Every structure is written in structure tokens, then in C-alpha cells.
Regions:
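Conserved helicase motor core of P-loop NTPases
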Residues: 1-132
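C-terminal accessory regions
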Residues: 121-214
Length: 214
């Protein structure tokens, strides 16, 4: 589980139902299906969420991979390699580039890589279109399950990214989005289930959709 869970709500307007849902979660009260203002608790997921929602949050890494594969197919990214306009997430801080673990970006260009085992992307902050794009070098293993991740010597001086359509609640800490879909896997976290769910709900500024598992 994450080392730190936020316990103060500060992103939402005071009358936003997100606060009500987050408070229920923090107090370990089970959430009920229904509509809460612009927010929703449901028992099924609609793939249109990858068009309509800013960020999907899950609990398990395996679920994250499945969701990202579904998102890419739904959005018609048919290549096994990352393409222009795809959303990616930083997996490791890089002080030289000024990027941090959990930051999300969009691929805006495909460049010639230094070796066939790497991708070279031009990327831009996911929600700041005015920011200048910069280049990154990423080993293919971070996007391709058929390629093993090499040792640190091979990765030295390069960056680490993965697809960002769905990310774990752990990776979401410190970030915020206008709309969030939470695929509720809080059961994975045992006694900390309510803290995980609270953290995910409070990543949303304006609207949250929670998909309750059966």
C-alpha cells in the first residue's frame, strides 16, 4: 500500500458530492449504487470512459495492464508500439528533464532512437498544451510484455514510462483531474481499504465515477 494517504479534502467545492462520498469512504461506510449530483456509483464499466473521463484509477497492477490494453483497442491504437497522441505516465523521477514519478504526458512525436531496443518520443505535459515538448528515450520493455527489462546499466541516462489510460491509486497520489473513474479494488488493501478508496475519490475535482466490483 502507499506510504502516505491524504486525509484532508482540499480540491473540491464544499457542496460537491465528492466530499460526501470521500467522507463515507474515510469513515469506512460502504458506498451504495446511485447518482450523486454529477457523480455516479455503478456496477459496470463503459469503455466510453476512456473518452469521457480524464483518468481511470485501479488497485492492482494486473488490472492496470488489462485496462490499458482495452483502452488502446477502444481508441484505435492498433500498433504494439506507442503511437502519437497516446497518454503515458512517468515511472521514475528524472531531475535533468524535470519530470517526476506519476506525471502524465502525451506523445506528440516519434523520433529516431539510438538503438532498435529503444523508443525516442517527443512528449508534452498531458494537460498543458502550451508547454514546450521535449524528447525522451525509453526502453521498449516498458511497453512490450515480450521484451525483458534490462539491467540498470542499459537504462542509465534513459527514462521510464508506461501507458497512462489506467493507473494505480498509488501512482495517483499528489495528482488531480477534473473527472476520475475509480475501479473499486479496495478489497486488495485489507484493513486499509477505506484509505485507498478515499485517496482515489479525492483525486477528482469535479466528477467521480466509481465502479463497484460484484
Amino acid at each position: 500500500t502507499p506510504d502516505v494517504m491524504l486525509t484532508e479534502i482540499h480540491r473540491q467545492a464544499k457542496d460537491n458530492p465528492i466530499i460526501h462520498l470521500a467522507t463515507l469512504a474515510r469513515n469506512k461506510q460502504r458506498l451504495k449504487l446511485g447518482t450523486y449530483g454529477d457523480s455516479l456509483i455503478t456496477d459496470s464499466i463503459n469503455l466510453n470512459c476512456f473518452n469521457d473521463i480524464n483518468q481511470v484509477l485501479v488497485g492492482k497492477n494486473d488490472t492496470r495492464k488489462i485496462m490499458n490494453n482495452r483502452a488502446r483497442k477502444f481508441l484505435k491504437f492498433d500498433s504494439e508500439d506507442p503511437l502519437i497522441d497516446e497518454r503515458i505516465i512517468c515511472l521514475q523521477n528524472d531531475a535533468t528533464l524535470g519530470i517526476y514519478n506519476g506525471g502524465t504526458f502525451k506523445i506528440v512525436d516519434r523520433l529516431k532512437a539510438k538503438s532498435p531496443n529503444f523508443y525516442k518520443f517527443g512528449i508534452q505535459d498531458d494537460y498543458s498544451q502550451n508547454e514546450q515538448a521535449f524528447s525522451t528515450s525509453v526502453h521498449k520493455s516498458f511497453f512490450r510484455a515480450d521484451i525483458p527489462i534490462p539491467n540498470w546499466k542499459v537504462l542509465k541516462g534513459t527514462q521510464q514510462f508506461d501507458y497512462a489510460y489506467a493507473i494505480t491509486g498509488h501512482k495517483s497520489q499528489g495528482s488531480q483531474w477534473k473527472s476520475v473513474l475509480v475501479y473499486d479494488e479496495s478489497y486488495v488493501f485489507g484493513d486499509n481499504w477505506s484509505r485507498w478508496l478515499y485517496t482515489c475519490i479525492t483525486r477528482a475535482e469535479e466528477r467521480v465515477e466509481i465502479v463497484m466490483k460484484e
